[in-house]
A protein has these predicted regions:
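Mobile active-site "lid"/loop adjacent to the S-adenosyl-L-methionine
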Residues: 156-210, 214, 233
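Conserved SAM/SAH-binding beta-strand->alpha-helix loop
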Residues: 113-115
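A short acidic, Gly/Pro-enriched loop at the edge of an enzyme's catalytic core
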Residues: 143-153
Length: 284
């Protein structure tokens, strides 16, 4: 899975490429072929190297191609029903769903942060997929979507976002209105403090597990929860950044889920490192 040549083809002339705006297509095609291959290979490696050439153009397309292949591996329905909590301004899952279902997917997300929501909307206005952005907290998704109403829930770099929100709100940060990127360092530092002190068991873990529990209830039997995470090597030597914690977020979530007795079974896929990926199938 995620063969370099296959990913390059999907991004530069295949199903992902076809769903991009003309501007993004032009930016992509302007990259020399040798640099393109080297950069995509670097982005397929987790943790990714620092300062990957053309990373700003390629990163989300690589993630979209990876999710597209996961959808194929699980033989998900052509008219895919997707829920993504904590989407922020990130569009890889939406692009992957658009490509997989040829514009016939149904995608729902919950996004309280207004700045990130506006940034996301600016990226996806050209897509044909039915897209619903709910202005609410991810913990309240069951008031908007019914049981067994989706085929897959995608936690794309979402574990940290859910926990960061949970630890920041009690400290007085309004995560719905704050400018996310300039304040994310503070959120991450608070998260690290709470893991180190053990407070995370009372504030952080419960909120994430509620979101995951809701995702299980939303997903039809036989459907999937997909988790991925990464942390770029550029942050490894940054003094304030909790490198080891960020690298362990998927294993930490896996342990919490195992302790929860939720009706899920972990599925392994080739080439998907369990340090950075987790696939859970809803039991019948």
């Amino acid at each position: 899975m995620w063969n370099l040549e296959g990913v390059i083809k999907t991004i530069t002339q295949g199903t992902i490429f076809e769903k991009l705006t003309q501007q993004r297509q032009a930016e992509l095609m302007a990259i020399p072929k040798t640099e393109l291959a080297e950069s995509i290979a670097a982005l397929l490696t987790r943790p990714p190297a620092p300062r990957i050439p053309h990373g700003g153009v390629l990163s989300n397309l690589v993630y979209a191609a990876q999710y597209y292949e996961v959808f194929e591996a699980f033989d998900l329905p052509e008219q895919l029903r997707v829920f993504e909590p904590c989407v922020g301004a990130s569009d890889p899952i939406i692009i992957a769903a658009e490509a997989y279902s040829d514009g016939q997917a149904d995608y729902t997300t919950v996004n309280l942060n207004r700045t990130l929501r506006e940034e996301l909307q600016g990226k996806i206005g050209h897509l044909e997929t039915s897209i619903h952005i709910i202005d609410d907290n991810a913990q309240r998704v069951l008031t908007h979507l019914g049981t067994n109403s989706v085929d897959v829930v995608c936690f794309h770099h979402a574990i940290n976002d859910a926990i960061q929100t949970a630890v920041s709100e009690p400290r007085g940060m309004d995560t719905a209105t704050v400018d996310w990127w300039p304040n994310e360092r503070q959120m991450i530092e608070w998260m690290a403090e709470d893991f180190e002190s053990g407070v995370i068991e009372k504030c952080g873990k419960p909120e994430l597990m509620e979101i995951i529990g809701n995702a299980v209830e939303l997903t039809r039997p036989g459907g999937y929860l997909i988790f991925d995470h990464w942390s770029g090597l550029v942050y490894r030597d940054v003094e304030w950044f909790p490198w080891e914690l960020f690298c362990d977020l998927v294993p930490i979530a896996r342990q919490w889920i195992e302790e929860s007795n939720l009706p899920v079974t972990e599925i392994k896929l080739p080439d998907a490192d369990p340090q950075w990926w987790m696939f859970l199938q809803i039991e019948n």
